[in-house]
Curated annotation (Swiss-Prot):
InterPro entries: HMG_box_dom_sf, YABBY, YABBY_C, YABBY_N. This is Axial regulator YABBY 3. Keywords: Developmental protein, DNA-binding, Metal-binding, Nucleus, Zinc, Zinc-finger. It comes from Arabidopsis thaliana (Mouse-ear cress). A zinc finger (C4-type) spans 30-57.
Length: 240
């Protein structure tokens, strides 16, 4: 046996009974005569490239002794066995399950990466049902929407409300001692007896019943400007 790293040694291939207890036993396959050779490698030649001569066909083989997997235990522990029996091949069903399992794992990893890229706010949950991998996307619980108070819409006051408000102010200005209830009743009567206000008619076109209203109500209240009721002691309001 010779080495290519500036060191050389020679040893023929002998049966395992002739090997030293300090040497390491490895096997070499001769591709010329298709023979497996048991070679004793000294500890100094480990992890080196050595030359082995086949004892069957005298062919020279160049072997790199650098793989621990090719080394067998020492000869003293080996006994009379030449090579350990190879492990039995796995059943075909197991191979198919391993292959399909590897494919499922790769597909699941790709789908998980794809889902996480497109749905950053969602969790990908893997479940197995009847031997099949199923993907479930569960959305993150979203925070409840903030309860905003309803916006109050400002309504435009109607013509009636504007008239009543202004009329109450006018009546109270003429008679500060009058109650708000009496002023409101007088303002309502003025609105009822002058229908031209409802239709937006000008004050220059008074209705024909204006004179009659003044005559009928002259005794019950004091007349104001434009025939409106002013403040008076008797405004036709029933007191409880």
């Amino acid at each position: 046996m010779s080495s290519m790293s500036m060191s050389s040694s020679s040893a023929p291939a002998f049966p395992p009974d002739h090997f030293s207890s300090t040497d390491q036993l490895c096997y070499v396959h001769c591709s010329f005569c298709d023979t497996v050779l048991a070679v004793s490698v000294p500890p100094s030649s480990l992890f080196k490239t050595v030359t082995v001569r086949c004892g069957h066909c005298s062919n020279l083989l160049s072997v790199t002794v650098s793989m621990r997997a090719l080394l067998l235990p020492s000869v003293s522990n080996l006994g009379h066995s030449f090579l350990p029996p190879p492990p039995p091949p796995p059943p075909p069903n197991l191979l198919e399950e391993m292959r399909s399992g590897g494919q499922n794992i790769n597909m699941n990893m790709m789908m998980s990466h794809h889902a996480s890229a497109h749905h950053p706010n969602e969790h990908l949950v893997m479940a197995t049902r009847n031997g099949r991998s199923v993907d479930h996307l569960q959305e993150m619980p979203r925070p409840p929407p903030a309860n905003r108070p309803p916006e109050k819409r400002q309504r435009v006051p109607s013509a009636y409300n504007r008239f009543i408000k202004e009329e109450i102010q006018r009546i109270k200005a003429g008679n500060p001692d009058i109650s708000h209830r009496e002023a409101f009743s007088a303002a309502a009567k003025n609105w009822a007896h002058f229908p031209h206000i409802h239709f937006g008619l000008m004050a220059d076109h008074p209705p024909t019943k204006k004179a009659n209203v003044r005559q009928q109500e002259g005794e019950d209240g004091m007349m104001g400007r434009e025939g409106f009721y002013g403040s008076a002691a008797n405004v036709g309001v029933a007191h409880n």
